[in-house]
C-alpha cells in the first residue's frame, strides 16, 4: 500500500469522507458540520489537514496537525487527529500521513511533535512508538464548555 498512497492537502470537497472517517475514530459528525470545521482548518495558517488517497483514488485517511507558540517550551506541533479507514490499516498509510505532518511541522520551525492518545487505544500507542515517538507523560484531561 505504501507506494500506492498519495497524500495531499485536504479540500472542502473532502468533508463528507473526512466526517465518515471521524466516526471510525469515535467522533461522529455530519458532512455539513465537517465542512464548516474543515473550512476553519484550511484557512488556519498554524494548522494543516492532509488526506491519504488509495491507488484507486478513494480517501482512506486524514491527519490534522497544528502549532501554537508556547512560552514553556520550544515551538512544537501537535497531532490533533489521525485516522485511517479500518479496512486500510497496517499497510503504511498512517505512517505516510504522519510523515507529511512532520514535514509540515519542520517547515513551521517546530522542534518536536506531540500526540495525545486515549489510554484505551493500545494499537495506536504501538503505531506511534514504531514511528519514533516516545511515551513521556501520563495526564488527565479537563474541559469546560463556553
What does each model-found stretch correspond to?
Residues 75-86:
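Conserved acetyl-CoA binding element of GNAT-fold acetyltransferases
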Residues 98, 105-117:
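Conserved GNAT acetyl-CoA-binding A-motif
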Residues 84, 90-103, 126, 130:
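Conserved acetyl-CoA-binding loop-helix of GNAT-fold acetyltransferases
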Residues 95, 119-138:
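Conserved active-site alpha-helix within GNAT-family acetyltransferase domains
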Residues 10, 82-84, 117:
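Hydrophobic adenine-recognition pocket in adenosine-nucleotide-binding enzymes
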Residues 5-6:
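Extreme N-terminal starter segment of soluble prokaryotic enzymes
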Amino acid at each position: 500500500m505504501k507506494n500506492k498512497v498519495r497524500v495531499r492537502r485536504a479540500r472542502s470537497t473532502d468533508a463528507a469522507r473526512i466526517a465518515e472517517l471521524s466516526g471510525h475514530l469515535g467522533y461522529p459528525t455530519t458532512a455539513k458540520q465537517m465542512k464548516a470545521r474543515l473550512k476553519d482548518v484550511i484557512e488556519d495558517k498554524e494548522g494543516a489537514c492532509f488526506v491519504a488517497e488509495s491507488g484507486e483514488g478513494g480517501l482512506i485517511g486524514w491527519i490534522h496537525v497544528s502549532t501554537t507558540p508556547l512560552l514553556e517550551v520550544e515551538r512544537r506541533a501537535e497531532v490533533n487527529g489521525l485516522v485511517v479507514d479500518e479496512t486500510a490499516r497496517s499497510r503504511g498509510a498512517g505512517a505516510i500521513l504522519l510523515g507529511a505532518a512532520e514535514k509540515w511541522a519542520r517547515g513551521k520551525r517546530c522542534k518536536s511533535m506531540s500526540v495525545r492518545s486515549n489510554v484505551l487505544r493500545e494499537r495506536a500507542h504501538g503505531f506511534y512508538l514504531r514511528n519514533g515517538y516516545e511515551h513521556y507523560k501520563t495526564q488527565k484531561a479537563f474541559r469546560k464548555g463556553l
